[in-house]
Design a protein with these regions (language model features):
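Blade/loop signatures of beta-propeller domains
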Residues: 33-70
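Beta-propeller domains
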Residues: 55-83, 88-95, 100-129
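Structural signature of eukaryotic scaffold interfaces centered on beta-propeller domains
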Residues: 82-95, 131-147, 191-204, 253-268, ...
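Hydrophobic beta-strand positions that form the internal "hydrophobic ladder"
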Residues: 99, 150, 208, 272, ...
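Structural motif
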Residues: 106-113, 157-165, 215-225, 278-286, ...
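Asp-box/WD-like beta-propeller blade repeats and closely related beta-sheet repeat scaffolds
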Residues: 125-215, 236-249
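Loop/turn-rich, solvent-exposed surfaces of beta-rich toroidal or solenoidal domains
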Residues: 321-327, 338-413
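Blade-level signature of beta-propeller repeat domains, shared across WD40, Kelch, NHL, RCC1
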Residues: 420-463
Length: 463
């Protein structure tokens, strides 16, 4: 894959060079202690440290702590634990005093956290020494305003958006989406119709989104957005019909029909990114209008690789030329993208997976986007680290002043397909100071009783 990448780089350089713009001096540095060179930092061998004992990454110097081990998931002992699948869910409370992880069996397990000492603790209501089992499905999202509040859905009422308040332990309905007037109607109690678990919330807590209507993920056809003042608004991706209690009604501007894999609300609350399940790329719905725009997998918009929604922008890997070729584009003009890393590393490396998270985004989309990179297990074992930014946790400058990459740690993850939990998917806190990620620690955690690879959740301090 690496030799092939060099050829792709030479062929594509002229095409892509028109979009390179971020050069020059570094802007205001948010991470003054981080390494920002582009040198190769090989990985120092290290045994998995014990849980809840802070340590220092030997290669980049960042403070870290192991958050989970085989005993953490008391609902399913000896099983894997992981972070959110997308980087879009907000797994940190607004004040960094709490976070949650996902355990095998679809359980949400929440902990207390001391940002000063990185000490992990049990929350009120939990058995001492254990996590608190939160009665929401995976991919729940903390409020960006209220650190006591977590939004999601339950297995028993998947068409109802609920909130969980930690101080009282109360689970309360926020919206029964069957009352939103979708066409055709969603029917409460119909066990053949569920929602995805992708509940997202705007930065001001005013809007919440969900995708729903199918039998399972990938078969949904409704995106429903709830405005706490105005009410519901919905879009049926199979018929193209848009309706609700506010805004214009009628047919979406796109003629494409498709089923939904996931849908993610922008932090502004004005847009929803919709991942289709028919490999058409993704769509963006301008919620207050009938405008739905496709960012196609084909063509020159480079929309195919993993990405993340910000306030009013979208950042994604280009999936072209080089692994660190990361693009930023406004959600209201998807073909107008800028290259965040310039010049690109040379010689180029292509084939590394790149996942991003941007829960720290501000209203101008100018704060760093963070992420992790990883190779498939067989490639990692064959090549090891041969290029800068491989198997790392990092953040990238997005303000247009420069192309700084802040480097924090090796993630020590070995992706073993098809075991999703072996990917080092990350989740950054609202203040951009902590990064939660999944790792099997170079395979040293071993297998479970069925022979499947284990993984745990780790925290690195970004400073």
């Amino acid at each position: 894959m690496k030799r092939k990448a060099i050829k792709q780089w030479l062929l594509g350089l002229a095409t892509f060079s028109a979009f390179v713009r971020f050069v020059g001096a570094q802007g205001v540095p948010p991470y003054t202690n981080a390494i920002t060179d582009w040198n190769i930092h090989t990985e120092t061998a290290m045994s998995p440290p014990p849980v809840n004992l802070p340590f220092v990454d030997p290669d980049f110097g960042s403070s870290m702590v192991r958050a989970t081990d085989r005993t953490t998931n008391f609902k399913n002992p000896g099983s894997w634990l992981r972070t959110s699948a997308s980087g879009e869910a907000n797994m940190w409370s607004a004040d960094n005093s709490k976070f949650y992880v996902i355990g095998e069996g679809g359980v949400d397990l929440a902990f207390g956290f001391n940002p000063s000492t990185m000490a992990i603790s049990s929350l009120p209501g939990a058995t001492p020494g254990q996590a608190l089992h939160v009665p929401l499905r995976p991919e729940a999202s903390f409020s960006f305003v209220d650190p006591d509040l977590l939004y999601g859905t339950t297995s028993s009422s998947p068409l109802t958006i609920s909130s969980y308040r930690f101080s009282s332990g109360v689970l309360a309905p926020v919206l029964d989406t069957t009352t939103c007037g979708t066409q055709p109607p969603l029917v409460a109690g119909n066990r053949l119709v569920v929602s995805d678990d992708d509940v997202n919330v705007s930065a001001d807590d005013a809007r919440i989104s969900i995708s729903e209507g199918g039998k399972q993920s990938g078969s949904d056809m409704f995106v429903t957005v709830y405005d706490k003042t105005l009410g519901c608004r919905w879009y049926n991706t199979q018929t193209g019909q848009i309706g609700g209690q506010w805004g214009p009604t009628g047919l979406a501007s796109t003629t494409e029909t498709y089923l939904i894999r996931h849908a993610y609300l922008s932090r502004s609350g004005n847009y929803v990114q919709i991942l289709d399940d028919q490999h058409l790329g993704f769509f963006v719905w301008d919620i207050a209008t009938l405008n739905v725009t496709n960012c196609s997998l084909s063509g020159s918009d480079f929309c195919g690789a993993y990405g993340v929604v910000g306030h009013s922008s979208y950042v994604n890997g280009a999936g072209y030329i080089e692994n660190m070729n990361i693009l930023k584009r406004p959600l209201n003009n998807l073909s107008q993208f800028a290259q965040l890393v310039s010049p690109l590393p040379s010689p180029p490396v292509f084939g590394n997976e790149l996942h991003l998270t941007w829960n720290n985004v501000d209203s101008s989309d100018s704060l760093p986007v963070c992420g992790s990179t990883y190779w498939p297990g067989e490639n990692w074992l064959e090549y090891g680290i041969t290029q800068a930014f491989e198997q790392e946790i990092f953040c990238v400058e997005t303000d247009g002043v420069a192309s700084t990459i802040w480097r924090f740690a090796h993630n020590r993850a070995t992706w073993q397909d098809p075991y999703f939990n072996t990917q080092p998917l990350g989740n950054v806190s609202k203040d951009g100071r902590f990064f939660l990620f999944t790792s099997g620690w170079d395979g040293q955690l071993g297998p479970d009783s069925k022979g499947n690879p284990l993984s745990d959740v780790w925290i690195v301090k970004l400073q």
